[in-house]
Amino acid sequence: MTTEEDMRSSSSESSPKSFLSLPYDVVFNCLSRVSRTHDPILSLVSKSFRSLLALPDLEAERFRILKNETCLYVCLNLNNNNNPNPSWFILSQTPKHKLIPLPSLPYPDPHPNCSTVVSTGSEIYLLGGFVAKEKRSRRAYVLDCKSHQWRRLPKMRIARKEAAANVIDGKINVYGGCSSEYHNSVNWGEIYDPMTQTWEPFPEGALNKEGVIPCALIKDGIAFPDCGLLISGKVYDTTTMDTLDYNTPMDKLDLCPNVCMLKIDNQDFQASVSDGKLKLVRCRGAMAWHWTVGGLEELSCNYLLSVASPGGGRRVTVWWKTYTKECKTEIWCALILLERELVWGVIEWSENVFTLPGSESDSDSNSFLLHYELVTLARH
C-alpha cells in the first residue's frame, strides 16, 4: 500500500531540478563558459543568477577561459509605440545573431536625444543630448559592459548636445555642442577623469586636439578637402564654421550620419548608405571616386538604413527594417566583406536580429542606428 509520504517523495523525485540546485562548482563552471553577450537575459532569471554573474571570481574565470571577447553594442531608435525611446542592445554571436536588450538608464531618466557616445576599456560613456523641451543636458552616464548596468556620473560643467568626444590617456575629451555664449571661451570643451570622477575645462591655451584629424567631406558625391574632422571614427562636417584651424574652437560640429571610416591598405575610405544602397568613397586631394558596392543582389529588395564599421577594416554591417503581415517590425543586419579592390561585397551572414510588435514605418536612415561601439573585454 502506497502511503502519502511515499507519494510526496515520488512527486519530489519526478519534479524537474533547478539548474542552481546543482553543485556550486558545476554551476560556476558552466556559467564561466557562457558568452557575456547572454548576461542580460541570464540576469532576468532570478536574483541568484544576477548575484552569480556579478562575482569577481566568475569574471576572472571567464577571462581565463574565453580570453578576449569583442562585443558590438548598438543604440537603435525603434520609433515604435511600444519602444518610444532609443534602446541599447548587444549583438549576440551564437547560436544565431540576435540583438539582446540591455537595461534602460537609471529610472526615471529618459534616454536623451542627440547625445554623444565614446568608449574606453569595458565602459561606454553617454554624454549630454536633448532632454525635456529640447534643452541641452549636462547629464552623463556610463555602461559597465561587464555587468551591463548603467550608472550616473557627475554632471558635465556645461550643457551639450551633439558634441564630439574621444579618449586621450584614459580621459574623456568632449568638444563643442554648447550654446553660443561659450563658443569663444575655455568652456567649449572639457575633460573627464575616470580616476578622480571630476570634470575640468581644457587648460587655457591648450585645445587638446590630439586625435582630431582633418579629412575630406563628401556631399552629393563631391569631395570637399579638409572640410571634415575625423574623431573616434566619426566624421563631422565643419563647413558651418567660420574657419578651421587648430586655434579655433570646434563650436559648430555637425555629425555626418551614416558615414563610417575604413582604413584599408593604409588608405582611407568612407562607407555610407545612400538611396538604400551601400556606397564607398575614396578621396585623394580634391578628387573623389565613389561607387555602389556590387555583389549584394541578395539585399537588393531591401532599403538599407544604416552602415557601421566597428573594426574599421574591410568588414561593415548594414541595417534595415522589414514589416510583416502580422503587424510586426523585423530588424535585419548583414555583415559584408569588401573584396576585389572594394568594388565587390561578400555577404558573410544576413539575419533577422530582432522582432518587435507594431509596424510604424520610418525610413529616415539618419535616425535609426544612433550609436555603435565595439568593446573588447580583455584579460588583464
From Swiss-Prot:
Keyword Repeat: yes
Protein name in UniProt: Putative F-box/kelch-repeat protein At2g44030
InterPro entries in alphabetical order: F-box-like_dom_sf, F-box/kelch-repeat_ARATH, F-box_dom, Kelch-typ_b-propeller, Kelch_1
Pfam families found in the cross-reference section: F-box, Kelch_FKB95
Sorted UniProt keywords: Kelch repeat, Repeat
Domain F-box: 16-66
Kelch repeats: 123-170, 172-219
